[in-house]
Amino acid sequence: MQKQAELYRGKAKTVYSTENPDLLVLEFRNDTSAGDGARIEQFDRKGMVNNKFNYFIMSKLAEAGIPTQMERLLSDTECLVKKLDMVPVECVVRNRAAGSLVKRLGIEEGIELNPPLFDLFLKNDAMHDPMVNESYCETFGWVSKENLARMKELTYKANDVLKKRFDDAGLILVDFKLEFGLYKGEVVLGDEFSPDGSRLWDKETLEKMDKDRFRQSLGGLIEAYEAVARRLGVQLD
């Protein structure tokens, strides 16, 4: 499957058309951004690591019965995916307090959240991805009530699957975001799951092993990503 025209260039990925109108090529670049794209740097191997990491996670979620857009790996930095009609709202699950939740509520970082919190954010970099709720989604027609309920159900199911897998690898799945779209009327998991869109801490030391290393200028970004991948059993080379 050959990539053709560039359809969309995001902060860290590029989407291309193919000869099949139902399939796209998703390319992971070495770019890393913070502050809604205000700060961007390149890291060797990052595109490869995130591509293979994403393929591994999507495969495990598919095995658990969660429909995903993933078709197959094409190269170290590219995969073939179904073309989805993307919902402009991100789903976030929080197992522990971190990031914007800590700032918003003034609570201590790291406290366990039981049951996990479920948040919705409008995908809009210019507006810094504002937090919304189910009422907004219905009023503004971003997604139907039925499809949003399905997105929430699949997000919690993904959390159950991944929380255990990361725990078995000596990692805490602090929080993560998922994006969904429609494929022939069905809600399907799209975009990616990688350390770019999740928070992952070492279970013993609480060391941050995700993009917070870049956001907070901690250093060792790729080393942390590769360490997480190895613990999970992702084949990188």
From Swiss-Prot:
Keywords assigned by UniProt, alphabetized: ATP-binding, Ligase, Nucleotide-binding, Purine biosynthesis
Family matches, as NCBIfam families: purC
SUPFAM superfamilies noted in UniProt: SAICAR synthase-like
Sequence similarity: Belongs to the SAICAR synthetase family.
Catalytic activity: 5-amino-1-(5-phospho-D-ribosyl)imidazole-4-carboxylate + L-aspartate + ATP = (2S)-2-[5-amino-1-(5-phospho-beta-D-ribosyl)imidazole-4-carboxamido]succinate + ADP + phosphate + 2 H(+)
EC number: 6.3.2.6
Pathway membership: Purine metabolism; IMP biosynthesis via de novo pathway; 5-amino-1-(5-phospho-D-ribosyl)imidazole-4-carboxamide from 5-amino-1-(5-phospho-D-ribosyl)imidazole-4-carboxylate: step 1/2
Cross-referenced Gene3D superfamilies: ATP-grasp fold, B domain, Phosphorylase Kinase, domain 1
One Pfam family per UniProt: SAICAR_synt
Disulfide bridge partners, by residue number: none
Example GO biological process: cobalamin biosynthetic process
HAMAP family: SAICAR_synth
Gene name of the encoded protein: purC
Designated name of the protein: Phosphoribosylaminoimidazole-succinocarboxamide synthase
Signal peptide interval: none
Recorded GO CC terms: cytosol
Broad class of enzyme this protein falls into: ligase
One Gene Ontology molecular-function label: phosphoribosylaminoimidazolesuccinocarboxamide synthase activity
InterPro entries found in the cross-reference section: SAICAR_synt/ADE2_N, SAICAR_synt_PurC, SAICAR_synth, SAICAR_synthetase, SAICAR_synthetase_CS
